[in-house]
């Protein structure tokens, strides 16, 4: 019996906060930054493959990463990789997948997930996803998965719940507040982080696009009509060149009145920075996260080191540093100044062009 459950993996980002290891030619989602032996996108596929059949996956990515996707997920076919000509944030990405699924199966239920998150308690996570799928099947609802915040982080969307039910209607959805507001949210105990994982019926999200992002609805309806025809590639290129770049959070989730959240605790991290890698990495007795081979540290504490295979490094006298070495770039930066990585990238690009980016 054919399944109506589908999983859409968003895999188009370049992971600039993980520079210089994450590069335009090989971004974060295709790397094994945590040393598990598998890339982030491979972990993501395997996580959802226990819920969704291989034929019901779609991966939305930049056109230049298509071969990488197929290399890391050989279970899927070429037609399951939707290629964005240029990145336009998450709303166009999700629209491309949603209108493709609407054409294929109007009864589809969609799980939408980033490609590069860490889930430590996968059984608990899949139980929550199953509950969300059942809820979405019975209701006209847009569901997101919420995470109890541990700090006032300005990099996440925040969800205010209206009650203490397992699946609660969202009272307020605020995308990336400033620090003062994030601190207030944390103090109330009513707010959760938005994990960026969504569940809904394809009909529900298409209706939300029609209602809240009508220009995207019109454009991607045109893409849907062109699917499988000679005009498909040209239509997709035109739509992505003309459509407004906007996140699904700003474009729909903050405006819609049928948003629900299932909050959970399953060891989630978006692993968005070297600092978060340090947090989850195995450490020595001096709190250093260093490779098991080839790295010799002296009088060094609370630092993280990433080296290419076969490279030897001797490090002495560092406290709370990030050291990332690649074949052509070495970055040494205090952990407290990690937010400057994008500034470093701009400086390198200004003087050396794109070859090191």
Task: Place the predicted regions along the sequence by residue.
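Left-handed beta-helix
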Residues: 2-4, 202-357
